[in-house]
């Protein structure tokens, strides 16, 4: 549901000026008696007599000062060093630190994820849970990190096993295109005890390959993933000075409408639907998912629509493993086209 748009009529009326309690009640405040018992008319507001002895602006409130001095620093940190990928290598800081940790310990063999998380804590000033979650996400895509063990399932939404039970290592692709110590700019880690890369000299547009999503302070990003071969062809055309167009490609597949894509710029839209096949007179099969949806969430929406009477469904089977297969069984007399 889109956010509710507010109008001027929805906003409470605020006073343009603040009057004293006496003025608000219609009672005039008594004038201070002058020396000698007489009364003098009030001095003009801008006269020395009116401003003499008036209180100054006073010290700034601690909360206001803290907000003014620290909030911009905090917002800049979240934008630049946490939630948004860097344009040079397409990586968020936690992803860059994970890859650097893998590079330091790389011997061609698998490493326990818990060990990588612990070693990465030397560079990452936040909790170990964020490192583990980012590493699992990179392993699920499989371009930079090769997983071994239960890394969960992006199709069903099943979670990965604990870091002590799963292993990972750098892929050959990552070793080839991501690292080059001779051309890397280094900086001290957050505690000054180690050196980490400012950015990695990636030879491939990683931010378009895996996509990215993050919410910072006053800024958010959502970059959709793209097909590896499409990116290679686009890079070659770009180097040769040829024009090209490229569209997102989703790991969950689906049927996409790019008519309002706007080349990925602000305001563009992509509509993705599940792919549904008619297996028999009273059976439908869902074989592809919209991006960002899981089989569990999709089945829940089907059952909710059935409960509300929008569609008629007998029962639903989820046979998804490496590929999506949701079987929707319809009751006698149901129309498959109407259900779709």
Give, region by region, the residue ranges found by the protein language model:
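Catalytic phosphate-handling regions of large nucleic-acid enzymes and associated NTPases
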Residues: 2-267, 326-329
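Charged, surface-exposed alpha-helical interface/stalk elements
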Residues: 249, 266-340
């Amino acid at each position: 549901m889109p956010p509710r748009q507010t109008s001027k009529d929805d906003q409470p009326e605020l006073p343009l000026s603040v009057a004293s309690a006496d003025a608000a009640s219609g009672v005039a405040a008594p004038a201070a008696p002058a020396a000698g018992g007489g009364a003098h008319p009030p001095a003009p507001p801008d006269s020395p007599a009116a401003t003499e002895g008036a209180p100054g602006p006073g010290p700034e409130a601690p909360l206001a000062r803290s907000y003014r001095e620290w909030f911009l620093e905090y917002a800049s940190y979240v934008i630049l060093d946490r939630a948004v990928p860097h344009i040079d290598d397409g990586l968020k800081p936690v992803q860059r630190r994970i890859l650097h940790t893998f590079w330091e310990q790389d011997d061609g063999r698998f490493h326990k994820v818990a060990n990588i998380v612990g070693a990465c804590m030397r560079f990452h000033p936040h909790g170990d849970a964020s490192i583990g979650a980012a590493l699992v996400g990179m392993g699920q895509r499989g371009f930079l990190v090769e997983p071994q063990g239960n890394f969960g399932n992006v199709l069903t939404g099943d979670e990965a096993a604990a870091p002590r039970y799963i292993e990972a290592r750098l892929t050959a692709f990552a070793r080839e295109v991501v690292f080059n110590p001779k051309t890397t700019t280094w900086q001290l880690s957050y505690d000054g005890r180690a050196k980490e890369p400012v950015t990695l000299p990636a030879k491939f547009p990683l931010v378009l390959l895996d996509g990215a999503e993050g919410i910072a302070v006053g800024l958010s990003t959502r970059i959709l993933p793209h097909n590896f071969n499409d990116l290679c062809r686009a890079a070659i055309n770009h180097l040769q000075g040829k024009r090209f167009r490229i569209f997102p490609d989703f790991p969950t597949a689906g049927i996409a409408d790019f008519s309002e894509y706007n080349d990925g710029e602000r305001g563009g839209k992509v509509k993705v639907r599940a792919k549904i096949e008619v297996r028999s007179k009273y059976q439908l099969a869902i074989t592809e998912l919209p991006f960002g949806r899981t089989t569990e969430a999709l089945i829940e929406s089907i059952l909710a629509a059935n409960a509300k009477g929008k569609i008629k469904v007998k029962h639903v089977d989820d046979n998804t493993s490496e590929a999506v297969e949701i079987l929707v069984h319809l009751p006698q007399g149901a129309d498959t086209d109407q259900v779709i």
